């Protein structure tokens, strides 16, 4: 692998792409450390040392590479774009106009991309306003004595400037991602997520060691590393697993030449839904805790939520989280893969699955296979998401932010595999032996 990587750097055009990607990453990380105007950076650092960021806040903190709680110009990171993309993907299923655009090919896709950018800016304004309002009230950091002093000047003018600064930081992140896609290596919208998550690993690992109680925290530290390696191996194995549905294409005569008559396949991944169900479940479970946090209510319902759904080690939380992941896995697969559309396209070009009639029987067969492989895929997602929480709960540290969580591992492995495959294809074009053997 290292020899292949060295050969990649010896190839002029590939080396140029790799160095360009690294340069964009450096710019992105610099922006993630420039504080927004009106923020007392020393107070922020003091509160970060005492912070417990979990749930949706922890998810956004992870996607921003630690920039969210530091309230920097790139504090929102790529999260508004991810949210906008998911919303547009869901709306495409229920709004006929968007569905028609999707079928128009490249021009329709460009229009949907334009809508996604507009929605990204709107969500950035909304999320930036929420972040600044939370920081002004002192609720951004729990149990921090100077939390209300992070934003010293609480005037409307300062608030507007902070919101505009963080909103203005979102389009450059999208632009940097598009530059990576066009002139670099990898998916430009995935690389910032990859770097942001990887940037949180060293600090999170050391925090686990510092908060550990067994052998000065080294046992907890070693356990987390071991669990991380096992999870990475499991995720790589499952993410590569797929059910291949054989498809036979008919032979066509054009002039005197024969075309087609070959066999291909439809790849159905075991984890067809990707990381989306985990994000949905985390976001939904964080809403009750958010309501309690801002209501400051001492009623019975608020106490029950505080006891059962704020920390991740309670059986109610674990069971609900697992059920939500399984539900959203089936839900997202149902809206992202349309067996009827696939069957119609196959019938249009004369393709068929051996032993299955074209048309409706093909769609029913694809639905049957997809439902069968989604079950193990959804259970796998639930396992990956819950193993870190349950492992840390065993050591009494369930409130500690776990660096090898399900979402982070799925994104790290997925983006890593995609990037390595792209480098592999570039090397094979030049007759070099690549990473994958």
Swiss-Prot record:
Q: Which UniProt keywords apply?
A: Cell membrane, Membrane, Protein transport, Translocation, Transmembrane, Transmembrane helix, Transport
Give an example GO biological process. Answer: protein transport by the Sec complex
Main localization category: membrane
Subcellular localization, as worded in the UniProt entry:
Cell membrane
Q: Which terms in the GO cellular component ontology are assigned?
A: plasma membrane
The way it spans or sits in the membrane comes to: Multi-pass membrane protein
InterPro entries (alphabetical): SecY (IPR026593), SecY/SEC61-alpha (IPR002208), SecY_CS (IPR030659), SecY_dom_sf (IPR023201)
SUPFAM superfamilies according to UniProt: Preprotein translocase SecY subunit (SSF103491)
Q: Membrane-crossing residues?
A: 19-39, 68-88, 121-141, 156-176, 188-208, 218-238, 274-294, 317-337, 378-398, 400-420
Nucleotide-binding is among the record's keywords: no
Give the protein's function: The central subunit of the protein translocation channel SecYEG. Consists of two halves formed by TMs 1-5 and 6-10. These two domains form a lateral gate at the front which open onto the bilayer between TMs 2 and 7, and are clamped together by SecE at the back. The channel is closed by both a pore ring composed of hydrophobic SecY resides and a short helix (helix 2A) on the extracellular side of the membrane which forms a plug. The plug probably moves laterally to allow the channel to open. The ring and the pore may move independently.
HAMAP family for the chain = SecY (MF_01465)
Q: Which family does it belong to?
A: Belongs to the SecY/SEC61-alpha family.
- Please give the subunit comment from the record: Component of the Sec protein translocase complex. Heterotrimer consisting of SecY, SecE and SecG subunits. The heterotrimers can form oligomers, although 1 heterotrimer is thought to be able to translocate proteins. Interacts with the ribosome. Interacts with SecDF, and other proteins may be involved. Interacts with SecA.
Its recorded name reads Protein translocase subunit SecY
Q: What is the scientific name of the source organism?
A: Streptomyces griseus
